[in-house]
Curated annotation (Swiss-Prot):
<protein>
    <recommendedName>
        <fullName>Ovomucoid</fullName>
    </recommendedName>
</protein>
<keyword id="KW-0677">Repeat</keyword>
<dbReference type="InterPro" id="IPR002350">
    <property type="entry name" value="Kazal_dom"/>
</dbReference>
<dbReference type="GO" id="GO:0004867">
    <property type="term" value="F:serine-type endopeptidase inhibitor activity"/>
</dbReference>
<feature type="domain" description="Kazal-like">
    <location>
        <begin position="6"/>
        <end position="56"/>
    </location>
</feature>
<feature type="disulfide bond">
    <location>
        <begin position="16"/>
        <end position="35"/>
    </location>
</feature>
<dbReference type="InterPro" id="IPR036058">
    <property type="entry name" value="Kazal_dom_sf"/>
</dbReference>
<keyword id="KW-0964">Secreted</keyword>
<feature type="disulfide bond">
    <location>
        <begin position="8"/>
        <end position="38"/>
    </location>
</feature>
<feature type="glycosylation site" description="N-linked (GlcNAc...) asparagine">
    <location>
        <position position="45"/>
    </location>
</feature>
<keyword id="KW-0722">Serine protease inhibitor</keyword>
<dbReference type="InterPro" id="IPR051597">
    <property type="entry name" value="Bifunctional_prot_inhibitor"/>
</dbReference>
<dbReference type="GO" id="GO:0005615">
    <property type="term" value="C:extracellular space"/>
</dbReference>
<keyword id="KW-0325">Glycoprotein</keyword>
<feature type="site" description="Reactive bond 3">
    <location>
        <begin position="18"/>
        <end position="19"/>
    </location>
</feature>
<keyword id="KW-1015">Disulfide bond</keyword>
<feature type="disulfide bond">
    <location>
        <begin position="24"/>
        <end position="56"/>
    </location>
</feature>
Length: 56
């Protein structure tokens, strides 16, 4: 089973677009897009991971 991952190396960003491309985090929370998710990953010091693409 391949691990699903997102490259968050360019984050955090001060503002995210309103683009809707949901991702489900390991915290079982749906993030609206990669930017919102990656900002949360940075805030969590890397403890938050991607569960899967799409809504939780």
């Amino acid at each position: 089973l391949a691990a699903v991952s997102v490259d968050c190396s360019e984050y955090p960003k001060p503002a995210c677009t309103m683009e809707q491309r949901p991702l489900c985090g390991s915290d079982n929370k749906t993030y609206g897009n990669k930017c919102n998710f990656c900002n949360a990953v940075v805030e969590s010091n890397g403890t938050l991971t991607l569960s899967h693409f799409g809504k939780c």
